[in-house]
Amino acid sequence: MKFLIFAFFGGVHLLSLCSGKAICKNGISKRTFEEIKEEIASCGDVAKAIINLAVYGKAQNRSYERLALLVDTVGPRLSGSKNLEKAIQIMYQNLQQDGLEKVHLEPVRIPHWERGEESAVMLEPRIHKIAILGLGSSIGTPPEGITAEVLVVTSFDELQRRASEARGKIVVYNQPYINYSRTVQYRTQGAVEAAKVGALASLIRSVASFSIYSPHTGIQEYQDGVPKIPTACITVEDAEMMSRMASHGIKIVIQLKMGAKTYPDTDSFNTVAEITGSKYPEQVVLVSGHLDSWDVGQGAMDDGGGAFISWEALSLIKDLGLRPKRTLRLVLWTAEEQGGVGAFQYYQLHKVNISNYSLVMESDAGTFLPTGLQFTGSEKARAIMEEVMSLLQPLNITQVLSHGEGTDINFWIQAGVPGASLLDDLYKYFFFHHSHGDTMTVMDPKQMNVAAAVWAVVSYVVADMEEMLPRS
């Protein structure tokens, strides 16, 4: 049956097949929820066509193959790097060749930091080369490096209790991994807290749920009025080893060398493409992922997958000849890893039209097998999204959970626009996150097919509804 559906929808231009009539007064909907449910249910055949094309049809594995071509040939795409700008230009050409509309680049200014050469060696109690990855925005060491005794702590509280021991030392954090959102504070704030008690540098246990001797990088933040000290992540294994040594009273000495340097901000671009709406072209449903990555691995998982299923969503809709009532806009963000820099500048440029944004969507937590969406919005909007997700019952992907926030869409969500993030299986995500292991080997083409289908169905149906999602 699915192949019959695909053959029918693949051969004609569907334009907008979901039915719906607005009954509004002073901008307030007078439709009952049952009427809205009927409108969404009328999109069932379109949803099946998208699923069949993405998962079983000629488009299967396309997002995976497109992604592999980019990351294998360009590699990692650090903010401020030539690789990132090369990738942006390639994507600009790709989106044009794909037949999408209003393809353009929106200029932004982004940070430019480079890690340079870096090394760490344990000198006492034995010689041991320590794998490190400097953290984004860290300063470097003097050319001769920093050689100092180590103080190992497991928390900020312990650091405060032992503050008198920290001066002139390298602080090593061996904090337990609870979850990413709770543990990442040691990466972002570890240098500042160590500097406050007089440390010369900080080394932080990688924020990872599993390790095969692999350090994980990421952004860190300095604080005005606090001395800047070099900071890097080390492996889980080395952090635990030094913690065991310290518990036995063994003196540890490390020599740390880091060539990290921050350069003036540089030019970059957010990459934009659309399928212009047939009835309300000024209104927008936004789908997105970020094109930049860290400078290790390939940035395939974070966030090549999210960027490419967002492109694939528009490709699927275009291939089926669909044109929703309002505009579907793809944005591939730049400099997300530095704190959503490109996304903030996009918001500043476009917030004048905030009343026309129905839904902002971001995929930046992997493209493993999805189970649904995370959503932030009014109760009425959530109820509507639950009906939209029911169209994905053929894939058994219907969950709508809370917390749809994402770094690049938070600006809109905080201003009241409904937001959604892809909900998928994160079991392996932090094995590879911000590490040399983030390569195409992590990616699964079949899982990407399903993720793209979810992304396309949700974005299309919301864009084709007669009315925008209700806000709080």
UniProtKB/Swiss-Prot annotation:
<feature type="signal peptide">
    <location>
        <begin position="1"/>
        <end position="20"/>
    </location>
</feature>
<comment type="function">
    <text>Carboxypeptidase that may play an important role in the hydrolysis of circulating peptides. Catalyzes the hydrolysis of dipeptides with unsubstituted terminals into amino acids. May play a role in the liberation of thyroxine hormone from its thyroglobulin (Tg) precursor.</text>
</comment>
<keyword id="KW-0862">Zinc</keyword>
<comment type="subunit">
    <text>Homodimer. The monomeric form is inactive while the homodimer is active.</text>
</comment>
<keyword id="KW-0378">Hydrolase</keyword>
<feature type="binding site">
    <location>
        <position position="290"/>
    </location>
    <ligand>
        <name>Zn(2+) 1</name>
    </ligand>
</feature>
<keyword id="KW-0645">Protease</keyword>
<keyword id="KW-0333">Golgi apparatus</keyword>
<feature type="glycosylation site" description="N-linked (GlcNAc...) asparagine">
    <location>
        <position position="61"/>
    </location>
</feature>
<dbReference type="GO" id="GO:0005783">
    <property type="term" value="C:endoplasmic reticulum"/>
</dbReference>
<feature type="binding site">
    <location>
        <position position="434"/>
    </location>
    <ligand>
        <name>Zn(2+) 2</name>
    </ligand>
</feature>
<dbReference type="GO" id="GO:0005615">
    <property type="term" value="C:extracellular space"/>
</dbReference>
<feature type="glycosylation site" description="N-linked (GlcNAc...) asparagine">
    <location>
        <position position="396"/>
    </location>
</feature>
<feature type="active site" description="Nucleophile">
    <location>
        <position position="336"/>
    </location>
</feature>
<dbReference type="InterPro" id="IPR007484">
    <property type="entry name" value="Peptidase_M28"/>
</dbReference>
<keyword id="KW-0458">Lysosome</keyword>
<feature type="propeptide">
    <location>
        <begin position="21"/>
        <end position="44"/>
    </location>
</feature>
<protein>
    <recommendedName>
        <fullName>Carboxypeptidase Q</fullName>
        <ecNumber>3.4.17.-</ecNumber>
    </recommendedName>
</protein>
<keyword id="KW-0479">Metal-binding</keyword>
<dbReference type="GO" id="GO:0006508">
    <property type="term" value="P:proteolysis"/>
</dbReference>
<keyword id="KW-0121">Carboxypeptidase</keyword>
<dbReference type="GO" id="GO:0005764">
    <property type="term" value="C:lysosome"/>
</dbReference>
<keyword id="KW-0482">Metalloprotease</keyword>
<dbReference type="GO" id="GO:0043171">
    <property type="term" value="P:peptide catabolic process"/>
</dbReference>
<feature type="binding site">
    <location>
        <position position="337"/>
    </location>
    <ligand>
        <name>Zn(2+) 2</name>
    </ligand>
</feature>
<dbReference type="GO" id="GO:0070573">
    <property type="term" value="F:metallodipeptidase activity"/>
</dbReference>
<feature type="glycosylation site" description="N-linked (GlcNAc...) asparagine">
    <location>
        <position position="353"/>
    </location>
</feature>
<keyword id="KW-0865">Zymogen</keyword>
<dbReference type="GO" id="GO:0005737">
    <property type="term" value="C:cytoplasm"/>
</dbReference>
<dbReference type="GO" id="GO:0043231">
    <property type="term" value="C:intracellular membrane-bounded organelle"/>
</dbReference>
<feature type="glycosylation site" description="N-linked (GlcNAc...) asparagine">
    <location>
        <position position="179"/>
    </location>
</feature>
<keyword id="KW-0732">Signal</keyword>
<dbReference type="GO" id="GO:0042246">
    <property type="term" value="P:tissue regeneration"/>
</dbReference>
<dbReference type="Pfam" id="PF04389">
    <property type="entry name" value="Peptidase_M28"/>
</dbReference>
<dbReference type="GO" id="GO:0046872">
    <property type="term" value="F:metal ion binding"/>
</dbReference>
<comment type="similarity">
    <text>Belongs to the peptidase M28 family.</text>
</comment>
<feature type="binding site">
    <location>
        <position position="364"/>
    </location>
    <ligand>
        <name>Zn(2+) 1</name>
    </ligand>
</feature>
<dbReference type="GO" id="GO:0042803">
    <property type="term" value="F:protein homodimerization activity"/>
</dbReference>
<dbReference type="GO" id="GO:0070062">
    <property type="term" value="C:extracellular exosome"/>
</dbReference>
<feature type="glycosylation site" description="N-linked (GlcNAc...) asparagine">
    <location>
        <position position="356"/>
    </location>
</feature>
<keyword id="KW-0256">Endoplasmic reticulum</keyword>
<dbReference type="InterPro" id="IPR039866">
    <property type="entry name" value="CPQ"/>
</dbReference>
